[in-house]
Design a protein with these regions (language model features):
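Flexible, solvent-exposed loop segments that connect beta-strands
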Residues: 20-25, 63-65, 104-106, 264-272
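Outer-membrane beta-barrel proteins
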Residues: 23-27, 39, 63-67, 78, ...
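Transmembrane beta-barrel architecture of outer membranes
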Residues: 28-38, 48, 70-78, 116-122, ...
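Exposed, low-structure sequence patches enriched in small/polar residues
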Residues: 11, 132-142, 148, 156-163, ...
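Surface-exposed coil loops of outer-membrane beta-barrel proteins
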Residues: 87-160, 175
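Beta-barrel outer-membrane channel/assembly domains of diderm bacteria
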Residues: 1-71, 75-81
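Residue-level signature of outer-membrane beta-barrel architecture
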Residues: 39-43, 79-83, 125-127, 161-163, ...
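A generic structural signal for ordered secondary structure
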Residues: 47-52, 84-89, 193-200, 237-239
Length: 290
């Protein structure tokens, strides 16, 4: 039997950023809305083929006489296999399909919202015996070799095992192949590994306390052929009640983005940071060890 699937997602984002004496980011307000209608077909209870459109409007964005109706319009189209324990996606699908707990050293909250589609493959296994216990891997093809775009792809993976009484441990991993484009043939390898452990418990509020290690080996082949190996530790504290969440992230360690302010080429006045090498929060480029 075949079933018709119809649905839609709606999300807004308001992010007011005010900084003083900050070298990493600019003060600004990000205010956007996204509407994503979907339609698809399901057969044999486990197979789905989904088509959708991602409609984004940045509030206050203007482009003169050529102003578009919307800030961005992009497709969603993917096949999904879904069973009791296993899910696999292939095509262009929403980032929300990921299960992994990825530190903002991997993806900033802005990256997660504005680069919300993955183009490639996702597979994960989720336990039905233990809560929040899973393993996943995904490949996101982010750029095609051309004059306008680098050839880029990212392999990500995450896993978590939840023990009794709320204790858990897990990992997150990313390998970003940041290759060249026509006129700028340099290649950069950028890896990030994050093993962690934590404890979830309730004491009137819901608490989640997690500590992890961040290791970021990377090599800019146009800069030199030496691997840079910065590392550090991160402690996350989350308090939740009545649908409201307070979160604090503390990073202690070395600059995880050492190529951020280095030019991508001798005759190219663009830094690796401006060119998109790092998807994580710029604050991880701290040189103050905190």
């Amino acid at each position: 039997a075949q079933n018709l699937i119809v649905g839609a997602d709606f999300a807004t984002r308001f992010d007011n950023r005010e900084y003083a004496n900050n070298d990493f980011n600019e003060s600004q307000t990000l205010f956007s809305a996204r509407f994503t209608p979907r339609i698809g077909v399901e057969w044999m209870e486990k197979n789905r083929l989904i088509f959708g459109v991602d409609l984004l409007q940045n509030f206050g964005q203007h482009n003169g006489a050529r102003e578009p109706f919307l800030s961005d319009v992009k497709p969603l189209i993917y096949y999904q296999f879904n069973s009791k324990n296993v899910q696999a996606n292939a095509g262009i699908f929403d980032r929300k399909e990921l299960l992994g707990d990825y530190s903002r050293a991997f993806f900033s909250d802005s990256t997660a919202f504005y680069h919300n589609r993955l183009s490639g493959f996702l597979g994960h296994y989720k336990s039905t015996e233990r809560r929040n216990t899973y393993v996943e891997m995904a490949i996101d093809w982010e750029g095609m070799y051309s004059e306008e775009s680098r050839e880029m792809f990212r392999i990500i993976s995450a896993g978590r095992y939840t023990l009794d009484k709320g204790f858990y441990f897990g990992y997150a991993f990313s390998m970003f192949h940041f290759a060249g484009k026509i006129g700028n043939e340099n290649v950069t390898d950028n890896l990030l590994v994050n093993p962690y452990a934590g404890w979830e418990f309730n004491a009137y509020f819901d608490f989640d306390i997690k500590a992890g290690f961040l290791f970021a080996p990377q090599r800019g082949r146009s800069v030199d052929h030496n691997w840079k190996k910065p590392c550090g530790a991160q402690i996350d504290f989350v308090l939740t009640k009545w649908g409201v969440k307070l979160e604090n992230n503390l990073y202690l360690g070395e600059n995880l983005q050492p190529l951020r302010n280095i030019a991508v080429g001798e005759d190219i006045p663009i830094t690796y940071g401006q060119d998109g090498l790092y998807a994580g929060e710029p604050f991880y480029a701290t040189t103050e060890h905190i």
